[in-house]
């Protein structure tokens, strides 16, 4: 059992200041992965040098920067922090909710009125998700036959771009409920694929019949691979049956298509207490829960494979180093079954 000591309070309080400063300096490119020194070109774009200097000075006080000939440089710890600064973006994108917590508790503001920084959220999600992409992409390219990709919840297009690096003669469909994501995705993939070979648009991915009607001619006579990266919790409404219905509709519409699914898991209290010092899962689950997103337990996700129109072909588990061996996230390759009982849905 841990005890309160002289470092407990500063360690908890420090995140209130350090996280926003790291986030904003990273987005402005003050520090990059290429060097420990300040990027002078990007520094010149900063209008308020007073605030910049105070921020840099603060980071030196907490050990992330040191001074070398009157120039700030990243320390070893600082370099590793800024190298992973994309990990700050998604939690930080929900900052309006945290800053309004008092008003929320007093009933003076509704959660739905707290805006998410969509640009930062899209940027952070895309960069954070990269670590989940590599093994599945290698697998699908070596084991599966496909000549088109339907990316449901395409975000900023990072997955699409990673697929195109390995296989560039594809037809691409990207669908997202966020107009910002649609615009960002188009911009990010535009240099890697001919314009007439992709179709990116706004839609609710749970409305399978609708988005299928928009792409039927485009993917006609092709073999689509369907991907869903961290989207099941967006459509579950906390119910397994909603995802099962979605999978059935998807299979009915694309009976020969494999699915690539990545998802985050709702860990129980015991695991969160066990791993909180080395994991951001308490924070991730907090903002997912408070924003009403339906993350399910590992047991619930595994139940999707029972009486399913898909069978599990391959599985990757992430961060399952805890006493219960429960992962914080997983990626599945799901193979479509040729025959299944629709009446079970």
Region spans (language model):
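C-terminal alpha-helical "lid/dimerization" subdomain adjacent to the S-adenosyl-L-methionine
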Residues: 262-308, 315
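Conserved class I S-adenosyl-L-methionine
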Residues: 145-155
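Conserved SAM/SAH-binding beta-strand->alpha-helix loop
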Residues: 178-180
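Conserved SAM-binding motif I beta-strand of class I
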Residues: 171-176
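Conserved Class I S-adenosyl-L-methionine-dependent methyltransferase catalytic core
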Residues: 58-144
């Amino acid at each position: 059992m841990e005890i309160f000591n002289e470092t407990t309070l500063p360690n908890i309080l420090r995140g209130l200041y350090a996280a926003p400063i790291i986030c904003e300096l990273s987005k402005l490119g003050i520090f990059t992965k290429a060097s420990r020194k300040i990027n002078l070109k990007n520094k010149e774009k900063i209008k308020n040098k007073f605030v910049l200097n105070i921020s840099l000075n603060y980071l030196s006080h907490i050990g992330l920067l040191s001074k070398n000939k009157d120039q700030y440089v990243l320390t070893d710890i600082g370099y590793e922090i800024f190298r992973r600064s994309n990990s700050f973006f998604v939690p930080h994108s929900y900052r309006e909710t945290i800053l309004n917590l008092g008003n929320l508790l007093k009933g003076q503001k509704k959660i739905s009125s707290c805006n998410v920084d969509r640009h930062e959220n899209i940027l952070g999600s895309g960069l954070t998700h990269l670590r989940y992409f590599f093994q599945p992409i290698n697998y699908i390219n070596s084991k599966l036959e496909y000549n088109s990709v339907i990316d449901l919840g395409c975000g900023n297009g990072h997955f699409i771009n990673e697929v195109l690096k390995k296989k560039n003669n594809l037809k691409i469909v990207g669908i997202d409920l966020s107009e910002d994501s649609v615009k960002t995705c188009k911009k990010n993939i535009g240099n890697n694929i001919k314009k007439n070979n992709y179709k990116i648009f706004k839609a609710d991915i749970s409305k399978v019949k609708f988005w299928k009607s928009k792409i039927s001619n485009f993917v006609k006579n092709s073999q689509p691979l369907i991907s869903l990266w961290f989207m099941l919790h967006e459509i579950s409404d906390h119910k397994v049956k909603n995802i099962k219905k979605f999978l059935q509709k998807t299979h009915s519409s694309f009976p020969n298509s494999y699915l690539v699914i990545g998802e985050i898991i709702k860990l129980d209290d015991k695991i969160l207490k066990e791993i909180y010092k080395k994991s951001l899962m308490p924070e991730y689950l907090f903002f997912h829960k408070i924003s009403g997103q339906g993350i399910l337990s590992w047991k619930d996700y595994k139940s999707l494979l029972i009486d399913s129109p898909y069978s599990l072909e391959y599985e990757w588990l992430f961060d399952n180093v805890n006493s219960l061996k429960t992962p914080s996230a997983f990626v599945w390759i799901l193979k479509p079954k040729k025959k299944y009982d629709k009446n079970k849905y």
